[in-house]
Amino acid sequence: MADFLTAKSNATDCQALLDALYADDLLGEPSGPSALTGFEQGDSRLFEQVAGYDRAGLDARMKWLRTLPDTCDEFTATGSGGAERTVQVTEASVPDVGDARTGLRVTVRGDADGAPATLTLDLATVRVDTSAVTVMGGGLDGGRTDSVEQAVRQGTERLKTVLDGGTPSPLPGDLD
């Protein structure tokens, strides 16, 4: 999966997207507390980050993410050894939670181990005041839309509980 995200593009915004996906920092560097967790199964993974940000920087980064389906609709990235990969970026729906939200689906087509392969990632970011939940899920066997949406809903509710001074339930399914 990493080989697909370390490819290089001549388009600045598109390269910035690939770099952010590889580094797991779609919203940039947090300016406050942050927590990061991830799960892998086979060629798929689910990643979630909750963090505090500078409000202006957070809003700017979310605005930038919303431009990517137009700016980086479809582009070519070159992997190590000169292998070309076709990258497509489309808008994705995000549950109506939080103060602001944006979603993307990124599809990278190329060869892996000498055979055609497609990496699909579903991405969602939700802002709550100056904090945000970022969820990314997918892999070589497809996106994880349902898992990403569920993680966004639960993560946003848990973040709101913490920001309101409460302690979230120890089990994500037991929302207060």
Language-model features: locations:
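Residue-level signal for alpha-helical context at structural boundaries
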Residues: 76-83, 143, 166, 173
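Sec-exported extracytoplasmic/periplasmic mature domains
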Residues: 55-56, 67-70, 153-164
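Short, low-complexity, Pro/Ser/Thr/Gly-rich segments in the mature regions of secreted, periplasmic
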Residues: 159-176
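A small/polar (G/S/T-enriched), proline-flanked helix-loop surface module common
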Residues: 1-111, 115
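A short, solvent-exposed beta-edge/loop patch
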Residues: 87-158
